[in-house]
Structures are given as C-alpha cells and as structure tokens.
Design a protein with these regions (language model features):
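TRAFAC-class small GTPase G-domain
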Residues: 1-181
Length: 181
C-alpha cells in the first residue's frame, strides 16, 4: 500500500509549544526566529514533504499534513471534524503545562487515538523542554501511555534530534497503517 500523504494531529494543552514545533518541523522558521507564542485559533494546517523515509526497505518521500490544533477547549466542538481521516497523533506538553497535562493528555488520547482505533505506534508524546534542566521524569502519566513512545525534545539545543525523532515516528505510523491495511 502506497501512502503519499499522512494526516497527523498535533495536540496538547495551551502554551505547550505545538505551533513552534510544527513550524520547526515544516522548516517554516529557524528556532532563533521564533517569536513569543500566540494562541492558535481552532486549527492551522501545515503541509510539507518529509524526504527519504524508509517504507518496506525503500526510501520514499512522504507528504505530511500536520494539523496544529488549539489547546483551548472552546474549540472542542471542532474535534469531530479534526478526527476525520486521522492517521497519527502527536501529543505535546511542557514543564509549564504538567499540572494540567496528565488529565488533558488522557482526554486527548482517548478521543483522538483510542476512539478512532489508532494503535499506540501511531501516537507519540513530545515533552517540550524549554531548558536543559527540564526532565521528562517530572511528568507522571497513567498506564494508558505505557506503550506510547515518550520523547523529551529541546528545540534550542536539539532541533536536529527532533527531526530524527519525528522521522522515526512517521516510519512507525506508516508501519502501523500497512499492518492494518
């Protein structure tokens, strides 16, 4: 099965860094150019090509449709539309959002991963560290997340690492889709 476009949702509490991560992955910005965060209104779709992804032993280019979703619950009425055709979910939280993150991520995982019957391999959690002393160990998640890959990211010191982690995640999504196709 040839997948040429993937619909990936980026979800998480407000002010966790979703838009900055989406912009960085799509190469819309250099991290040095990132201004102060502004709340996303509803959803913002960023499209870009991810080259040289290994699919069944062959390198291919994958078009990514990254849906940068607002963390504001006043847009919750849009959730059913966002979920249509979803093939993967990136959950994002940061040290500044850990207080609300546990409950919020559980809600988002249930609605956008469990209910549309995505596998845990089609989900990843990015813990957006804003400085080098931040530690993913400070995030306490339920057993729901035991099979979900959890990755600490730091755009300021490890942006290239994020791109590698993202490519690995996309490979995982493609493998899961091919397994259930």
């Amino acid at each position: 099965m040839h997948m040429n476009k993937l619909k990936i949702l980026m979800l998480g509490p407000s002010e966790s860094g979703k838009t900055t991560i989406a912009n960085y992955l799509s190469e819309s910005i250099n991290i040095e150019e990132a201004g102060p965060p502004r709340p996303t209104q509803g959803v913002r779709i960023v499209e870009f090509e991810l080259p040289n992804i290994n699919v069944n032993g062959k390198n291919t280019n994958i078009d990514i449709e990254l849906w940068d979703c607002s963390g504001d619950h006043r847009f919750e009425s849009c959730w059913p539309a966002l979920r249509v055709g979803v093939q993967g979910a990136i959950l994002v939280c940061s040290p500044t959002t850990t207080q609300v993150a546990t409950r919020e991520l559980e809600l988002l995982y249930n609605y956008f991963v469990s209910q549309p019957k995505l596998s845990a391999k089609q989900c990843v959690l990015f813990y957006n560290c804003t400085n080098d002393s931040d530690d993913i160990e400070s995030l306490t998640l339920s057993s729901t997340f035991s099979k979900v890959s959890q990755v600490a990211i730091n755009l300021k010191s490890g942006g290239n690492r994020l791109k590698i982690d993202f490519s690995n995640y996309i490979t995982s999504v493609l493998q899961a889709i091919n397994r259930y196709a």
